[in-house]
Amino acid sequence: MKQLTSSQVRQMFLDFFKEHGHMVMQSASLIPQDDPTLLWINSGVATMKKYFDGSVVPKNHRITSSQKSIRTNDIENVGKTARHQTFFEMLGNFSVGDYFKKEVIPWAWEFLTSPKWLGLDPDKLYVTVYPKDTEAYHMWHDVVGLPEDHIVKLEDNFWDIGEGPCGPDSEIFYDRGQENNDVAEDDPENFPGGENARYLEIWNIVFSQFNHLPNGKYVDQPHKNIDTGMGLERVVSIIQDAPTNFETDLFMPIIKETEKLSDGKKYAANKEDDVAFKIIADHVRAVSFAIADGALPSNSGRGYVLRRLIRRADLNGQRLGIKGAFLYKLVPVVGEIMKSHYPEVVDQQAFIQKVIKNEEERFQVTLSSGLNLLDNIIAEAKKSDDKTISGKDAFKLFDTYGFPYELTFEAAQDAGLKIDKKGFDEEMKAQKERARKARGNLQSMGSQDVTLMNIKDKSEFEYGTLEEKHAKLIDIVVDDKLVDKADGEHATLIFDKTPFYAERGGQVADHGEILNQNGELVARVTDVQHAPNDQNLHFVDVILPLEKGQEYVLKVDQKRRRGLKHNHTATHLLHAALREVLGTHTHQAGSLVEPDYLRFDFTSLEPMTKKEIASVEKLVNEKIWEEIPVKTTVTDPDTGLKMGALALFGEKYGDTVRVVQIDDFSTEFCGGTHCENTDQIGMLKIVSESAVGAGTRRIIAVTGPEAYKYVTDRDEILKEVQDEVKATKAEDVVNKISSIEDDLRASQKEAEQLKAQINKAKAGDLFNDIKQVKDLTVIAAQADVEGMNDLRELADNWKSSNKSDVLVLAAEVNGKANMVISLDDKAIKAGLKAGDLIKTAAPIFGGGGGGRPNMAQAGGKNPAGLKDAIAKVLQEVEEKQN
């Protein structure tokens, strides 16, 4: 079998189908675009829906992709099984009304078995087909040449989700050998498609040829489609001879780095620790890519999934003796593994690490206390008659210590306990009834609180006010009820006028304080949202009693507001600069304005070059340093458009709009807060540029003090590098590194030449011990080598030496067994086949292998069996000669 990296396998798949006329489609964002039915992109075909339903016609009806995907329906199994993951890649080839079975089945076989491609052993491949799908059976048996006993007919091989397109499918399985099975050889489930660990599904080909009608009938589709999916992690585990997906190069670097962070723990030392290592490796991949694509931890939807994954990883870090926040330290490892095809984690590394670290630090505050409480709760539940954790206890862990219910559920399962889920739900409902905020209703999909809808009082937002503002409190909402006084924990307030900006248009809300007439702090403003009737809703933590009708002093957090103003004006400059550098086809596709950074999404079919990024950054800073006044005009939409204002796609504008102008460089409709002059921004620095999805790019940038910090941090890094490479000045660093690289390459070349000489010398020693086995001469020995490549090189030396007819070389490498068998023409004519010999020997050292008649190789887990395996080969050589 070929030795391939995961990156090589991925690229090989795309190259194969590109050769067969397919358009290679970039992986879409994990966050579905225009598909509210999906929380995450969970398969390759999920991104093809628009093509298969006919809403969009593809440029090429043959498409291939490697699609990053997230599935979270069985998070609790991750780490406990060989194949479960939350984040995975799905390799796929798709036909939108183009080719069908007679093309796709031979292609699949060619890719899997051809030496040019994966080169898997055909004898180890099995397929399943739908019993009535005689066409697929014919293609596999009569065209591909698969034996009957390698084709299994299963009723389950029909893809149907109700009304709509459907059809039979064919799954391809790889036989990992009975030694890797978890059921007995005579078990009824021991077959391809059964519940067993021996036959690993690697590819599913769906033949979408019918339409399932509402009346239950199936009719032929006029245009037949192909949808296939191959799990990258699964096929890589086969190629890299890994027991599970986690021992591949997609996970092991993360696991090795986690070992360094742990309290002396080592992977493969015990089962419990292995589960923790696997959970951490999987979850950091998922959260890194999800954050890169725009998801952030929160208490709902995708954000809740991220929060759960991060906290589950942190809990397992504790089990490995890791103290404090650590998951963010693994992000660079994820980026390095995946950068060849997915550069976004490397591009957004600092931001991803910041998000994860902040989330970890929030959880770490209560983690230790929460774990102690959990241990006590479990101990008490074990003493109870019903062995059940009460809903009240589970809710306390959730509400006070931030333990998602699912984590407590997993801990209970591991301890052999149950949880009173009904009791937990009742506690959750009671809490919502006690302290539910109107904000929760506003932020849910399309729902608006009845109480807020009935508030008609006018409230005016004053843009320019940053100093203290006196205002009358006209409405108080507590627990979804209008009240005259607030003396509790939380409240929602409406004033007759306010300087607090409510979140809108990508700009987050102002924070600040509310004082009484005596200058005493009565409330902290933690968020501001728009009410149904457009008043600004101030969500506050109540410090002292608040009364309706009283005058209060409203103080905006000026530092936060300044950061928001600077970054919002900077997004306008950035938008204009992108359109000037990339072209006017570039449009804003989304934005986020925070006090300490900005995120700007824009339409673009291609990544920006380094030169383009530098040009955009330079242009923005030139406009900042030109000290241009920022002018705002309130007018009607038509007048605004005549002024040249850009209207954002998908935005709805009322009768009155606000136009923000920066000379003739930028004119946009915008309701956000802005600088009075561009020079207040100071400077802008682009931190990263990456893909969000097909046709959308994302820039993350910082301004002012954050930009200065970003530059100085990198200057410090450059100085460290300068010192490390002993460069006289910073300008010499690149040349110095190039010189070091040249020296390193020269040293590596010398080392390789020396190694070749050593191997040649070893070959001379090994090849002098020649045995006569009937009519054939045999060299059979265990070699002292560093790797499988050295073993193969010795075999190559043997070919040119003409020392014997048969070569059997074995070696122990890194605790694993390896064997190579080579035959000359005389041995082959005598009836021997290297592949047959290796298959006989491999089980003795706990492995498997295969190859061609003249050369074969195998690997295994038990080096102690190599001596007996060599003896077995010699016996076979004697018995199998004609």
Swiss-Prot record:
Keywords: Aminoacyl-tRNA synthetase, ATP-binding, Cytoplasm, Ligase, Metal-binding, Nucleotide-binding, Protein biosynthesis, RNA-binding, tRNA-binding, Zinc
Listed cofactors: Zn(2+)
Catalytic reactions of this protein: tRNA(Ala) + L-alanine + ATP = L-alanyl-tRNA(Ala) + AMP + diphosphate
Protein name in the entry: Alanine--tRNA ligase
Function noted in UniProt: Catalyzes the attachment of alanine to tRNA(Ala) in a two-step reaction: alanine is first activated by ATP to form Ala-AMP and then transferred to the acceptor end of tRNA(Ala). Also edits incorrectly charged Ser-tRNA(Ala) and Gly-tRNA(Ala) via its editing domain.
Pfam families the record matches: DHHA1, tRNA-synt_2c, tRNA_SAD
Native organism: Lactobacillus johnsonii (strain CNCM I-12250 / La1 / NCC 533)
Subcellular location per the Swiss-Prot or TrEMBL entry: Cytoplasm
Entry's free-text remark on domains: Consists of three domains; the N-terminal catalytic domain, the editing domain and the C-terminal C-Ala domain. The editing domain removes incorrectly charged amino acids, while the C-Ala domain, along with tRNA(Ala), serves as a bridge to cooperatively bring together the editing and aminoacylation centers thus stimulating deacylation of misacylated tRNAs.
GO CC terms of this entry: cytosol
Database matches in InterPro entries: aa-tRNA-synth_II/BPL/LPL, Ala-tRNA-lgiase_IIc, Ala-tRNA-ligase_IIc_anticod-bd, Ala-tRNA-synth_IIc_core, Ala-tRNA-synth_IIc_N, Ala-tRNA_ligase, Ala_tRNA_ligase_euk/bac, DHHA1_dom
